[in-house]
Regions:
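Conserved RecA-like ASCE P-loop NTPase motor core of nucleic-acid helicases/translocases
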Residues: 128-132, 137-138
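Noncatalytic, basic helical substrate-engagement surface that gates or grips nucleic-acid strands
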Residues: 2-125, 130
Length: 138
């Protein structure tokens, strides 16, 4: 059976960033590259261990989603994205493109909405790096 992997970019980026929060990875220019390093390590692990036939990395869109229009207070209590993560996003997108992996971003829809919609058409496998999410029912 062919395997399709759809990765939620921001879930991985936040996970990577906070994994190094006590010992951040700082480059020679003084920039925190923790999110970049952690994201690439996870991507490499998925590619090596799972050898997917197809893979895509799904990002949340800029400017919010239909939920923000329906309910302006949606996620209003969340803290602002850390500057180090905002700094990392263009680099991560460039790296993904360097791997020749599609970057998927659908206007008005969060990454998990896109992943859930696409997953309904495929057999769903959750790689070991995502063990905590195995309880999700699609």
């Amino acid at each position: 059976m062919k395997k399709l992997f759809l990765l939620d970019a921001y879930a991985l980026i936040y996970r990577a960033y906070y994994a190094f929060i006590r010992v951040p990875r700082i480059n020679s220019k003084g920039q925190n590259t923790s999110a970049i390093l952690g994201f690439v390590n996870t991507l490499e692990e998925v590619l090596r261990r799972e050898n997917p036939d197809y893979i895509g990395v799904v990002f949340d869109p800029k400017g919010g989603t239909f939920r923000h229009k329906l309910y302006p207070a949606y996620k209003a209590q969340r803290e602002e994205t850390p500057e180090d993560i905002r700094f990392a996003i263009p680099y991560i997108k460039s790296i993904i493109e360097g791997y020749r992996i599609p970057v998927i971003e659908v206007e008005n829809y969060e990454a998990d909405d896109v992943i859930g919609t696409l997953a309904k058409r495929f057999a769903v496998l959750i790689p070991p790096v995502f063990e905590p999410f195995k309880t999700i029912n699609l």
